[in-house]
């Protein structure tokens, strides 16, 4: 039996990676690097929640109107031309994500995407536990909240977006609380996931650690 690294490099093989972790833990950068390294499609599951949030705002649907939000989640269509990387949208999306019916509806979309995409790395909060429990490789990325807030602050500044570091930190702490305490698919690593704390590691070092792990797992 071939090791995971060999299988991942073989583009004739189906290969799925689940990449979970809290906000601003470095998942995006690491996910893109792994996708490029192994020629995988990269998909952020948070996009479906951000799209739903954008749709609620544009259609003037109050997120406290649970029935309306649930109904909208059943007919989600992604618009790849939108810029959904907005802290306000992200904060509202994390509130919508705790609605169990919404999460179930959007997870159906994500599960179908994984099943119909032969080679994919999907990033999110519950990919390894719910969306792709049979993934070839499951990774859980974490980091200190202060480090994560600083990373997000620098990302937003680089994009020319106004932001305040302390506000970002408070949003991250609140999002962590919501993610960990929600009744449906709370944020936690799969029992067989590789867990990496990126607080003191560069993205390159993390990818190297993952690649080494893949060499010894079959």
From Swiss-Prot:
InterPro entries: Cytidylate_kin, Cytidylate_kinase_dom, P-loop_NTPase
Location, primary (coarse class): cytoplasm
GO biological process, one term: pyrimidine nucleotide metabolic process
Entry keyword set: ATP-binding, Cytoplasm, Kinase, Nucleotide-binding, Transferase
One Gene Ontology molecular-function label: ATP binding
Recorded GO CC terms: cytoplasm
UniProt keyword Cell inner membrane present: no
The EC number(s) this enzyme carries: 2.7.4.25
Pfam families: Cytidylate_kin
Binding, ATP: 21-29
Compartmental location: Cytoplasm
Catalytically driven reaction(s): CMP + ATP = CDP + ADP; dCMP + ATP = dCDP + ADP
Organism domain of life: Bacteria
UniProt KW Kinase keyword: yes
HAMAP family cross-referenced by the UniProt entry: Cytidyl_kinase_type1
Family label: Belongs to the cytidylate kinase family. Type 1 subfamily.
Name of the protein in its database record: Cytidylate kinase
């Amino acid at each position: 039996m071939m090791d995971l690294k060999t299988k991942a490099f073989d583009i004739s093989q189906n290969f799925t990676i689940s990449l979970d972790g809290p906000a601003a833990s470095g998942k995006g950068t690491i996910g893109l690097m792994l996708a490029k390294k192994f020629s995988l499609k990269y998909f952020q599951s948070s996009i479906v929640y951000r799209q739903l949030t954008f749709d609620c705002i544009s259609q003037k649907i109050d997120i406290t109107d649970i029935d309306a939000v649930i109904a909208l989640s059943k007919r989600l269509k992604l618009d790849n031309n939108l810029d959904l990387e907005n802290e306000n949208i992200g904060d509202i999306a994390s509130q919508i994500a705790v609605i169990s019916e919404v999460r179930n509806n959007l997870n159906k979309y994500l599960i179908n995407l994984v099943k119909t995409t032969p080679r994919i790395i999907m990033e999110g909060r519950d990919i390894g536990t719910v969306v792709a429990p049979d993934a070839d490789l499951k990774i859980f990325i974490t980091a200190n909240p202060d480090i994560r807030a600083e990373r997000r602050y620098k990302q937003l500044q680089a994009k020319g977006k106004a932001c305040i570091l302390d506000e970002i930190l408070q949003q991250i702490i609140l999002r962590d609380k919501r993610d960990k305490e929600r009744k449906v698919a709370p944020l936690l690593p799969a029992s067989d996931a590789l867990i990496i704390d990126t607080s003191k590691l560069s993205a390159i070092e993390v990818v190297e650690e993952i690649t080494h792990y893949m060499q010894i797992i079959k």
